[in-house]
Every structure is written in C-alpha cells, then in structure tokens.
Amino acid sequence: MSTDIEGLPQEDINELVDETIAENEVVLFMKGTAIAPECGYSETALHHIRRHRDDVECVDILHSDEEFRAALERHSGWTTIPQAYVDGEFVGGADVLEELDERGELADALNA
C-alpha cells in the first residue's frame, strides 16, 4: 500500500490509518516494502509474521509525513516503527513479535 498523503488534512490521514487497520486481518506498518524492507527491525518483524502467515498487508511508511506517524501513535501509543496490528488491535513491534515467536505464542496472536 502506498502512503502518498501529502496535503491531506490530519482527519483524513487518521481515517486512512483507521480503515487500513480495520480492513486487514494482519497489517504491518514498516519502513520499506515486503520485497525490500528498509530497516532491520522491519525485516525482523516481517520475518516473524511470515513464519506463520503469508497474507499480511505491508504499508511502507518510510517516506510518510509526520501526520501519518501521528495517526499510528494515536492507535498504539508507540512512536517507533514497525507496528503490527491483528484484527484491529496493536500487537507490537519487532521485539514483541520476536518474543512472542520465541515463546510459541505468535501463531495464535496472528490467528494462524
């Protein structure tokens, strides 16, 4: 998914983030794409999700405006990227996904 939101008011950006989270069972807001992650944390998060599911919506926010990041923070309370959501609920970033995977709990968390 592209995040070309330049010039949109914050309310519209908030709505776009809300819709993306609501319309996808598993969504990962990351730096880069599923094919070419642009940071190690995004690559780690995607790796752990893909161990259990192939169907994940990846949203590249690398070049997004601060308003887009603010909309994400409104959902999660976190300022860091990546951020994973399952069934509309914030799960965590790379470290949380890795920990859940190591404990054998990630598959359940991802509805896999």
Regions found by a protein language model. Give the residues of each.
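Haloarchaeal acidic low-complexity proteome signature biased toward cell-envelope/secretome components but also
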Residues: 1-21, 107-112
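Local sequence-structure signature of Cys/Sec-based thiol-disulfide redox active-site neighborhoods
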Residues: 16-55
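Cytosolic beta-strand hydrophobic patch enriched in CBS
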Residues: 28-29, 82-87
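Thiol-based oxidoreductase modules, predominantly thioredoxin-like and allied folds used
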Residues: 53-68
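Thiol/disulfide oxidoreductase modules built on the thioredoxin-like
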Residues: 72-80
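Non-catalytic, surface beta->alpha helical segment in thiol-disulfide oxidoreductase systems
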Residues: 85-112
